[in-house]
From Swiss-Prot:
Protein name as it appears in the record: Phytosulfokine-alpha
Record keywords, A-Z: Growth factor, Secreted, Sulfation
Signal sequence, renumbered to the chain: none
Superkingdom of origin: Eukaryota
Source organism of the structure: Daucus carota
Length: 5
C-alpha cells in the first residue's frame, strides 16, 4: 500500500 500527496 502506497499513499502520496
Amino acid at each position: 500500500y502506497i499513499y502520496t500527496q
